[in-house]
Amino acid sequence: MGHSIYLADDEKSIRELLHSFLASDGYTVHSFESGDALLEAFRQEPAELVILDIMMPGTDGLTVCRELRSVSDIPIILLTAKDSELDYVMGISQGSDDYLTKPFRPTILLMKVRALLRRVEMDRGKTAAAVDELHYGDLRYSATENAVLRGNTPVALTQTELRLLSYMMKQPEKAYSREELLNAVWGFDSEVETRVTDETLRRIRKKLLHAGSTVSVSTIWGFGYKLKEAERT
């Protein structure tokens, strides 16, 4: 039996199309026409990945995403009919791992599903060999506490933000390309078009500033990003 996926979309035609497409690739798919139904099923038996339409009657996808993220770090993909920057930012801020704007090709969704589940498997394999602590500037990553801390205070990061920042802290002076970060943190191939790296790092930069950290995320135009310890005067 393949990985279990929960899918919620109030549009029956889309729900049935995606269900059939994912099931044909070997996944065990359970479809729901509302966010409330998905949440109820998840409480009984958690899935390994969730796909959510944002605009659903009743409990919308953003709320469901927030509820799921409060109890689980499973991969979450949001779907929306709006090509809205606000929807994208809201989705990432609620803890989603990626985002697709309708209409989209089912093959793109399948690539993202495969990549996210591959990342989960990679994370499990790395757990035993994981570094217990990392330090850069006034930041400390603790595997035991599953957090990045400034002093004794955790920086308020989502699990995806934590994975990304801790990955960059392993070699903080290194310049990371978007492609490397996509592969290392999300498991995506460089051909998968996504804004998720840029948006996640923008949020990390904002949160580090809010925490008063000397560490910031520096943009290397045309290439990617690196961590930088700011000079304090």
Question: What is the predicted role of each segment?
Answer:
Residues 16-24:
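Charged docking surfaces used in two-component/phosphorelay signaling
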Residues 2, 46-48, 71-75, 191:
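His-Asp phosphorelay/catalytic-motif detector in bacterial-type signaling
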Residues 4, 115-175, 179, 228:
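Short, Lys/Arg-enriched segments at the junction into DNA-binding effector domains
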